[in-house]
Design a protein with these regions (language model features):
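NAD(P)-binding Rossmann-fold cofactor-contacting core
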Residues: 1-5, 12
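Residues at the C-termini of beta-strands that transition into short coil/loop
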Residues: 13, 51, 76, 103, ...
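Internal alpha-helical scaffold of NAD(P)-dependent oxidoreductase catalytic cores
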Residues: 93-157
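Rossmann-like NAD(P)-binding element
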Residues: 11-48
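Rossmann-like NAD(P)(H) cofactor-binding subdomain of soluble oxidoreductases
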Residues: 36-87
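Short, flexible, solvent-exposed loop/turn segments with mixed acidic/basic and small polar residues
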Residues: 87-93
Length: 157
């Protein structure tokens, strides 16, 4: 809280007041958080996860959003470094970077504009829309496969 990045705690009193919730924790944790707290989210709120995989998260979070009447969109900012943790954060991390969206429906142009407007302060360069399955397939080849291959190469005799 000393850095000013955290303004307070999310709890039973503050969650209902949020218009935008960004779930920036691991996939299982994001889905569990929403399952545990979905009843507190205002029906007008927009909730996005920022996880690197979409199938598990969307499969669990879309039904929670439907049950409680708020909007959930899967999201994956395509930016970052090999470092993790708050001490490696940068204000310009997303400037010009692409953002992948997995909406509950592909024909809701107003929702896509709402997400784009909500994320505007981050400075994303472009938004693309896909399914959870297609997202995870693309990420497996473009992000995870190079890690697997380089690891195998390093460990080979």
């Amino acid at each position: 809280m000393l850095s000013g990045a955290v303004h307070g705690r999310l709890d039973e009193e503050t969650i209902p007041a949020c218009e935008l919730l960004l779930l920036a924790i691991y996939p299982g944790g994001s889905a569990k958080w929403l399952e545990d707290n979905g009843r507190l989210v205002d029906s007008g709120a927009l909730v996005l996860d920022l996880c690197g995989i979409k199938q598990e998260v969307c499969k669990r979070c879309f039904p929670v959003a439907r049950k409680y009447g708020f909007t959930f969109v899967g999201g994956h900012p395509m930016a970052g470094t090999h470092f993790s943790g708050f001490k490696y954060s940068r204000a310009d991390l997303y400037k010009g970077a692409p953002m992948v969206l997995v909406p509950p429906r592909f024909d809701d142009i107003d929702l896509l504009q709402r997400v784009k407007d909500a994320m505007a302060p981050c400075g994303f360069g472009m938004f693309s829309v896909t399914t959870a399955e297609e997202h995870d397939r693309m990420i497996a080849f473009t992000s995870q496969m190079p890690h697997v291959l380089s690891n195998a190469f390093i460990k080979s005799p």
